[in-house]
Design a protein with these regions (language model features):
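Short, conserved beta-turn/loop elements at beta-strand boundaries and strand-helix junctions
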Residues: 56-60, 84
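Short acidic/polar mixed-charge low-complexity motifs
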Residues: 44-48, 71-73
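Hydrophobic pocket/interface hotspot
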Residues: 10-14, 20, 39, 52, ...
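Short beta-strand segments that buttress and anchor functional surface loops
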Residues: 37-44, 61-68
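Beta-strand/loop substructures that line and gate deep hydrophobic ligand-binding cavities in soluble
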Residues: 65-126
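Short, exposed beta-strand/loop patches in secreted or surface proteins that constitute
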Residues: 30-34, 41, 52-54
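Generic structural detector for well-ordered beta-strands
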Residues: 2-4, 51, 78
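Hydrophobic ligand-binding cavity/cleft-lining segments
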Residues: 1-33
């Protein structure tokens, strides 16, 4: 998803767990909150925890969602500058089809991520 905003600004906003509820519907619905166990949200499957990559200068926004089953789902995400001194960037979120996930469920996951990234773009571009 291309965003017509400087990569540093996009990274700053997207890397702040407190802002996730404004653009990531799945976590917004679950009421992402900081607890003694870390960032936690309620999901249709039960309570999940979300572990975020440490703040970095490379635009890496990877995160791990731990499901109630104990399964850890790794979500690679990047803010990639359009070039040196760029005033725009591409946000890349890799969605993988895990074992046991049907094609329909996978397609729904892809659509949900695309909608979340569209929300992020709209917020940051002021649309």
């Amino acid at each position: 998803m291309w965003i017509d905003v400087a990569p540093d600004a996009v990274y700053s906003y997207a890397s702040d767990p407190r802002q996730l509820a404004t653009w990531a519907a799945g976590l917004a619905e679950g009421g992402l909150r900081l607890t003694a166990r870390g960032w936690v949200a309620d999901s249709p499957m039960g309570e999940v925890t979300v572990e975020f990559t440490a703040t970095n200068a490379l635009g890496v926004l990877d995160h791990v969602v731990r499901l109630p089953s104990g399964e850890a789902v790794y979500n690679p995400m990047r803010v990639v500058p359009a070039g040196l001194d760029a005033t725009a960037c591409e946000v890349v979120f890799t969605v993988r089809q895990r074992p046991g996930v049907t094609d329909e469920q996978f397609e729904a996951d892809v659509a949900a991520v695309a909608a979340d990234l569209e929300s992020l773009r709209g917020l940051l571009e002021g649309q």
